[in-house]
Amino acid sequence: MEKTSSRIILAAISALCVSSNVGAMQQFIDPKDGMFDASQWVLDNAIGFMPVPIIITDPAVGVGGGAAMLFFHESEKRKQLREENPDEVVGLPPSVTAVAAAGTENGSWLTGAFHFGSWQEDTWRYQGGLFYGSFNLKYYAGDVPFDFNIDGLYFMQDIDYRIAGSNWFVGAKYSLLSSKSTFDIGFDIPSIPPIDFDLEDAGVELKVTYDSRDTIFTPNDGLKAKFSTDFHNTAFGGDVDYQKARAQVNYFAPVREDLIIGVRGDYQTVSDDAPYYARPFISMRGIAAMRYQGQDMALAELEARYDVTPRWSIVGFTGTGKAVEDGQSFSDADYQSVVGGGFRYLVARQLNMRVGVDAAKGPEEWAYYITVGHAWQL
């Protein structure tokens, strides 16, 4: 249920709303190259909310969609830098408030509100959200799937502080998930109803982040790494006690002006007493959410983007990962690998924001994705 700030911001670009007023269309034309561009529409729309369509294509929940209402808040400093340097990408991220609702073909749905704020020239970064939803998913015991539903309320507050103007941040996050899970055990016996249980899960995350990326949207250069430890405890308002630790790295480098290479790594581990939904799973394009879970998870991914023109690009990617069960050695766990490709269009030059479509082949199926910004969110 958690939404990251960049995903909410990126969703606004995917709308590409076109006004019927001929004069209003001028804000969608970039004076630099005469191409379609949404930078001005996103950054200069300072009055009222914007309706934004949401497209969902995750194989775990099926195809679906929804809508969001977003309001951008650009600081005076960021606006000044953008207007003084219209050909440059301003590194300071805008703030955004959103209200959204979405549903999919398998009956899953989500609604909620979110705010991302960046203050004092990006010294402080804040995220806060409240969401309610219901998800119909599959839980795998080995290769045997069991249908289940989880519905509930998710609340989160997240703050990061930049250390002395450097690329290092320290931060903390509080989250509370109040949920009900219902499992269909697969036996058509009237006297045995589906198994269900309620759970309150509250936790505090402590984290250290390094971020030198040139933009939060579609980076061409830079590194973002985050090291975090989560403490879930009854003292924070929950019913369960467990811990999680995670290390994530996304690195981007321009091999040439028109060729960008990205490398991603992700490692997660969780204590024995974690609830089923908190167990790490392999998260890559081509693999459904929660398909391969374990007590430990590690993955690596490589992506290349070639800019055919300044606006149009093609991408290719591959990756592999393992989900390791308790008591199982890393070497005994099977690799789960993906390969895929797609295309991108530079839809907002002043944000270096690219959108497009990806197709990926995983161990069991093909999957298709609408990609807004970069597929790797951290």
Predicted regions, residues:
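N-terminal signal peptide c-region/cleavage motif recognized by signal peptidases
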Residues: 18-21
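Short loop/turn motifs that connect adjacent beta-strands in outer-membrane beta-barrel proteins
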Residues: 25-27, 38-47, 75-94, 120-125, ...
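Transmembrane beta-strand segments that form the barrel wall of outer-membrane beta-barrel proteins
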Residues: 38, 48-57, 93-103, 111, ...
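Gram-negative/organellar outer-membrane beta-barrel architecture
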Residues: 42-49, 55-200, 353-354, 360-367, ...
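Hydrophobic, lipid-facing positions within transmembrane beta-strands of outer-membrane proteins
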Residues: 49, 65-67, 109-113, 151-157, ...
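Extracellular loop and loop/strand-boundary signature of outer-membrane beta-barrel proteins
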Residues: 99-100, 141-146, 188-195, 231-237, ...
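C-terminal outer-membrane beta-barrel translocator/porin domains of Gram-negative envelope proteins
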Residues: 204-320, 324-326
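Predominantly the C-terminal beta-signal and adjacent terminal strand-loop region
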Residues: 208, 265, 329, 333-334, ...
